[in-house]
Amino acid sequence: MLNMYEEFPFWYTLFTEAGFDVKLSSESDFHRYEQALGSVMSDNICFPAKLVHSHIQELDDMLASGADDVQKFIFMPYVVFEPMDDSRNTNSYNCPIVSAYSDVIRSAMKLKNDVISPVINFRDEKLLQKQICNFLKGYGINKKEANMAFAEAQDAQHSYVTDIQQKAEQILAQSRRDGQLTILLAGRPYHTDPLIQHKLSEMIAALGVNVISDDIVRGNLSVGAGDTCLVRQWAYMNRLIKAGQWCAEQPFDVHYVQMTSFGCGPDSFIQDEIRIIMKKHGKPFTLLKIDDVSNIGSLKLRVRSLIESLSEQKQGEGEHKKQSEKSIKATGEQQKGAYKLPPVKRHILAPYFTEYLTPVVPPLCRLFGWDVEVMPQSDAESAELGLKYANNEVCYPATLIVGDFVKALKSGRYDIDNVSLVMSQTGGQCRATNYTALIRRAIDANGFSNVPLITIGVATQMGEDYGEEDNLDVPWLKMAPIIATSLLYGDVISKMYHGAVSRLKAEARRPEDKFANQAEQLREHYLTAVAEPILRNKPSEIMDLISEAALAFDAITDDKEIPAVGIVGEIFLKFSPFAHQFLAQRIIEKGFEVVPPLLTPFFLQEFVNAIAQKNMGLKSSKMPDFVLKSIYQLIWRRQKKMNALASKFRYYRPFTNIFEEAEAAKGVVSFAAQFGEGWLLPSDIISMVNQGVNNVASLQPFGCIANHIVSK
């Protein structure tokens, strides 16, 4: 199942050396798969994830029929990091589904046995050893025995990796001696499952072509890491891109074919990158999409056509090499001409995010010395342009943001020689880290390759350093009071507006000027008024505005109890009115109170995450927990003061303590779920329920790999 295809030699050796009796589920079977489909919670999740349910059900039945006097459990490790086998990569994450699907299994399936999922970090051997010793200690294995088992397991895994790499090299060498074609059949480790890949490797071999896997490039630093715009964050993705680069540089007797599962989030990003690599070297890129279909006739036909085509093209190897050299040279010249001046001297365009953040961003950035303009919110043209210039399988927020930037640059409103774009980079396992690559490709395709794209890190997810040249370093510490107060202010105004707009007095419901009612008018007034205190760097004046706003909103509000609907979900989708098709407004028009999503918890969760990363063995840190908690207490003190001031509005819903919210979510998902909204999404729901909100809408884009876990 999922990551077990990659590390089974390690786990089998570890458990057997520690005295466990290891039982393995049977080979994947379509009949058992169909029997377990009823517990699958997402129709558009990838086939390998759906298949997990049948394996878990079989293991549960197997253990239930065994002896009752022994300790039994189903082992499904929560592997966040794979080994970092190439120092040129940024990180070695698994995708959220591979890491965290055990959380979904426990929620979706009624099992007789426990599913045990220790958090695992294969990237750092010392931390891994500590994790293993702590895990085995719970089963009565002392440290000495655990260390011995760990050493044997590491040796077994190393031997396995070396063996499959050498086997691929041997097959290639023999293939060349025999003058035969070789196909590098690339995919995730779970694509070795015959049911998942529909025996593609055997199908190709039966046509007289030798097959090797992407394992041939494992740990080989003499192979290029891959010419790509992407942040190299996912372990499997890194290997696929590297294998594509290696294959592109080989003679025309080696070709690249990639298997991908429908709904694979990372592949929607990397397939275009590998296609570009192949095109530069004059080689075809073949992508085979596979799913749980039983009729694979069309797949066989495509494979046969591919092999026949490659056999004919092999004679044109010299011509392809010439095209390759020309393409690489042109690309290199374009990169040398890229803009390198400090972005601070340019007009900076930022994407629209939420109506409660947009008015705060320009004055905050002016305080830092930046000239930032927030673009208008997305519209139908944004969606159309995003679909045109980004892969159609990327997540919906990426489509809109790409479209927004392209639309702005093509509008003719800006001096292209004096404009930059800025985009946040969240880090972690979510695809949002690589939105910048999509934006870069899209604006280049429209002739704006000289426009710099600036990235701002908004999280400290497990210590990434992206090493970008065009970065803006936000002075978080120096400006912390005004930044925190400004962001919290936006959330406070949102709480007041949504608490008031469905309870307006009769006279307050009348349209006035351009506003539909007085609640909208007050919202606009107080979101505009905050600019001056921000520019003066006066957090205390912002606090005064909160007190004033509370009285103003209260004055237009009737005493009225109405049902409430909370909104949670993917961060862009739940905030952007166009992205969620104005859902919040429609709920308000039906007479319900909307309990709005808040922005500040997304940042404040980092205090919990940093402590959790250290305690779970995902990150080394010498900073004591009390230091982080003390820093948070300064913010919490500000939040409590805001609560006191804003409580003059009778329907104000106060901020809650982020550590208390995290504690409430502990039994729902692992704290290692730090992708997307992570554990914050279930904690938001729990917090709303505790406030008496019994209706919650969870908004997620189709195919969101983070929300496949946390929202389900």
Predicted features along the sequence, with ranges:
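An N-terminal assembly and electron-transfer interface module characteristic of large anaerobic redox
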Residues: 1-712
